[in-house]
């Protein structure tokens, strides 16, 4: 499927080495002021080729809005946009025409579809996530109307951990580090110099989300957020609130007691029973090391024969860095979708509207 969301949907298209990538946002309310400078600034945060901690593929990532915006305001029509691919080097992948890259989706996509684009992964390339970032930027323009903010940063790189998360630092950091930035940078560069890669974890928080978002059973807020984050290239695990640590606690430690003023703690991470509590929503995404590494590796070719190959091309030494920007975008899309879905959740809401 190429469409995400229920009430607010984002459909993406394009491949890594195709002419362009792009998206269509449907269900976006009319009357929202569209900030194209903010849109571009978000794309720039994810854009490749900006520094030595990302792939050297240098794309401008300029989004051209084709429809859905009139005189700077959303019109209620589908918002379509396109981002041209301008720095492909398809020859770097010619040696992969008959070979499955270890750790990539080459093998599984070929088994499913019987055909695959060997040039940088084609449709399944992380290049597509630029469209998600653009979609998330539009979602944030709507969230701004309600005082909702979403922030993400790199919490750890391998075994180097940030300590107390500092989102102000992350906003200024080349690698969006939440702390211990120099050690994280050093480890990323060490991996790159050794023709290897390294994993990372990303912390995301949502502030200002209203109480009551999410459906109680089959479209729970935490389940949809987890699915949105797991759908990002390279994410292997997602935690909400205490996450895995909750399995090590007693109920008396994990429960969030309440007073007249509200919750006394937030072990739940802002979600109970699949519905938002009004507290800060807290999520962690765990990214595997970039599977594209420049070491000799054994794999299979299309005939099922064992072969050895060495990768060429341009690749991120740590996908969690730019992945943190994508995580923010996906969370924005989910929160917007849930807010729009919630409008018809009870009679009082309907009477306010009609």
Swiss-Prot record:
The keyword Amino-acid biosynthesis applies. Pathway: Metabolic intermediate biosynthesis; chorismate biosynthesis; chorismate from D-erythrose 4-phosphate and phosphoenolpyruvate: step 7/7. One of its GO terms (biological process) is chorismate biosynthetic process. It is an enzyme of class 4 (lyase). The keyword Amino-acid biosynthesis applies. It catalyses: 5-O-(1-carboxyvinyl)-3-phosphoshikimate = chorismate + phosphate. GO terms for molecular function: chorismate synthase activity; FMN binding. NADP(+) binds at residue 46. Its EC number is 4.2.3.5. It holds the Pfam family Chorismate_synt. Homotetramer. PANTHER family: CHORISMATE SYNTHASE. This is Chorismate synthase. It comes from Campylobacter curvus (strain 525.92). The lineage of its organism: Bacteria, Pseudomonadati, Campylobacterota, Epsilonproteobacteria, Campylobacterales. The gene is aroC.
